[in-house]
């Protein structure tokens, strides 16, 4: 290192808007800065071929370019593969990838999911675990079929079958890879390390056979059955949907709510007022339900004279809706209404069936249809207290029918009335509207009811209603259908127990959204009457109807008399490009038959259905390995998962399907397993435990990602204009309104991930996701928010390294003097350097930043182990703030010290170098690109002695002995004093460079005063004041007012709140505050007795007295004397001049060691005095050899704020 280095010029600081009374000196002068290399200069200039260990980096890095370089470096050196190889024998941390569907373009919401999935495996790998990250692709089901249908211009099942099932299936298979390149590019560019080469694919034969095995297991145990139930039905697609799928499609709609009159058969002048929100179901009405315990009123309609029957509690409500009087003439019980017959709203079925009766099991006869029945679900929350029942279109309605059927003898039971076909259109059963889609029939039906005098009232009813989750415009209907179901209700309690052991983030998901869904569990509607999906592996005897399940294609081929495989063979011969995985799909698998084991001569034929694609994805814990047919060791090792994460909509999707399948197959532990199947012999844990939870132990439930954009009103007949940033909207013509909402493909109200990466980089996006808020909160994608991540974190960290490298280059700091380093450059190994001193021997600020580093390490590890990336990032941000805004800033003079061999200077370099190395490791999981860039720079002097990548390093371990809590607390208070002092200046509009006479620091107690007084010089410099005083009594400088916290105090004191407010306002605020601080409460004497108010009951407000400016922190109040003397003003002008000269040094591309000469032209007497009075300070701060007041010959003129600046750059050769 050089024996001597020059004094460094201080970096210019950003000027404040106000001049604080001193005026902007650059508006009052003409300034010439002349760059020279005087022969007598004691400085030196670093040459271009210097052998320094470090090089100053680019001042304004382009992070996207740096990231592309890092990606190439990772590829070149197989860094991901190396990271796995280094943990080959380490304990496992298991991550499951929730499989996306690659037949749609990825958007920023997918970036959030993949970033969260990446950060924890990276962290756990650095913490010593082996984390295999197997990618996956969800390739079956409605998402794929709908997209292919759109491409082909077809929608219904009839159109698909007319097109041809075989070519349709082949198109589905090829379409799932349509955007594969975009997904792979996104994954790579975001820095998501995952094994794409060996990804599991749900249509692959090995995966399908694993699913078949699980279904055979359920079938053999009697858990998979065929039943006639009311299901949520997608009429346009011709298939039932599961509860999880239905849950993803709800949205708010307005439907007609009708009050319809059902005249009683035996009292035609009296009508039941029956309520429904689905008028289209009225032609299939079978019953009207009442609650036996309710009181019902018979009222007279003042307009029509009719007698109406409805719940007594709802008479006033209905009268209000009708806007006329309803007079109560009698009250009756609900029980008395049960059994009464009525005229149905539409008579088609009555005409055809002629109002039949049936023989009761208990004897006697009763009408099969159109009578009042009892039901506990009837309420008076809304409607009329009488509910229309159409059992074909409601699960609860259907349960009533099931109960009613048990009352009648066989052969005389009521049949289900259903006037709607599977296509959602009316059939011959309701001929007047045959072929009309039910949701389009409501208006016609209500008009018919009005014309017949049956419609009493019509209004719009706002409620949530399900639509197909993959066809947004298609509303679902409840519909009777024979489907295959899994008896998940049998496992409800076990699923709840399993769920109770899972570590959910946020925790309320466990007993809230997810727990509630489990509580209301219904049997899983598994089968789909569709085409592209895992075929249901059940073959049925064509003679006896008996069935068996098949668990693999190999088992199927081994069946006696197998036939039909030639259909696949012929297809493959005709098109050799067809993947072999298609042979286990429709239509090829449908052709495979074999001899029935149940009756000689009969054949076994597969049922026609495929299964819910959510079952596919939920089976991935074992199906990704093709287990149990292969890879037993991998499955045992990789089950259950330690961590999964997806968005909140997956509580009814992938989270549920995994938990349900795993609970049913693998149970609670070996002790409760049923014998006879391989699944029930499996211990579902990798360690000694064999209990819940499985198949995942921890789950982060991500919030929804919303978009923020700017939208024009749009001219008539023209589409709206959508812009994605405020600056674009400001520059565009017309008025734009800021909008926030869901990401929309049609609106294109978000940037593509590739645009974001090219513009800001992946690290900026990742840090925004991790550090902006907890990931389970809804997050808004906005350009500005991601852009802000750059200066707030990435650039601040880069500038800290830049500061280090600039001065390390100047001074020749070379860490390779440490000759016994390990590959991770641990602090312990750096201690072998001759100039390295133990932390305990270094200065207080060195010990402080090391203490902060190790406190941060402990916090980050604690939070990341709890899957809390947000608070981990807050700790990192706080450390970086302390490093850059306090340690580096307060240590600059140490780096600028002229004695290059000073132990204190060496300490500063070693401290900053150590902390930067450790911080680079800490940030590696969060911002992997910047981390590796910094690692390459910081470790370059060591060459191959250091690991190639930071991602091969261990995560730093906190050392409790390095933590000095007392020092941390004291320095935190000192930093708060500096921060509050700057806030007080800003509030008083006093420039930072304007010195002030005094600062008063008011403390809550005197325990820290001695330590603070030993740092007076630091406080004076930080706050630019001449004197500092500390006190615990600030009455001379500030006054306090105490006001009620109305939200908290209102319920506590009630009507006395005005009295309390008046008493607090008239009391001495300073005395009340003292009482609050000493006693913990404030006591007031009310007429009713004493009232104690704690800190939550009141608010303390601060006001500085005349001549002072104040700001309050958590541990102090800082009060500045705002009186500015002429002497202080002149010093402030001199410091303004220094800032101006520093700016011009930058404009002239001065090196940090370059000496200059300065000339100032001004007629301002005060400024001239300031220059003469502070000449030494000005020259010392700016490395000026000369400072002249005079003319400026041959100078270049530069425009500045309110004045002119003349600059000449010459060389003194």
From Swiss-Prot:
It catalyses: tRNA(Ile) + L-isoleucine + ATP = L-isoleucyl-tRNA(Ile) + AMP + diphosphate. GO terms for molecular function: aminoacyl-tRNA deacylase activity; ATP binding; isoleucine-tRNA ligase activity; tRNA binding; zinc ion binding. GO terms for cellular component: cytoplasm. InterPro entries: aa-tRNA-synth_Ia (IPR002300), Anticodon_Ile_ABEc (IPR033709), Ile-tRNA-ligase (IPR002301), Ile-tRNA-ligase_type2 (IPR023586), M/V/L/I-tRNA-synth_anticd-bd (IPR013155), Rossmann-like_a/b/a_fold (IPR014729), tRNAsynth_Ia_anticodon-bd (IPR009080), Val/Leu/Ile-tRNA-synth_edit (IPR009008). Its EC number is 6.1.1.5. Belongs to the class-I aminoacyl-tRNA synthetase family. IleS type 2 subfamily. PANTHER family: ISOLEUCINE--TRNA LIGASE, CYTOPLASMIC, SOLEUCYL-TRNA SYNTHETASE. Monomer. IleRS has two distinct active sites: one for aminoacylation and one for editing. The misactivated valine is translocated from the active site to the editing site, which sterically excludes the correctly activated isoleucine. The single editing site contains two valyl binding pockets, one specific for each substrate (Val-AMP or Val-tRNA(Ile)). This is Isoleucine--tRNA ligase.
